[in-house]
């Protein structure tokens, strides 16, 4: 049964501006440790890839927070929600700490889709109860 649906569109230009203004601190606030390492590697190779990576993660986390109905209130935090990828490349939600406990206690499962184009990153998330 569907527990919740969330969607988000993120303006990549706003993410780029925030990075220019706040530097790595902005990325550290949004990304988990694993995501931050990936962001650093992508940014080193091609800075625009790093910006797009951060924008897609920002968008996916916003969509997930809407799907679970909490928004960005505890236990949902930027860093406790990680967007990983399966071996196939499919994006997946990986949770940590109190958010994982909250999610597991409700026997929920999440599915996320992420895309980006020149100026926008968009995500769609469906959370279902098992």
From Swiss-Prot:
Its EC number is 2.7.8.7. Coiled coil: none annotated. One of its GO terms (cellular component) is cytoplasm. The gene is acpS. NCBIfam families: acpS (TIGR00516), pantethn_trn (TIGR00556). Mg(2+) binds at residues 8, 62. GO terms for molecular function: holo-[acyl-carrier-protein] synthase activity; magnesium ion binding. This is Holo-[acyl-carrier-protein] synthase.
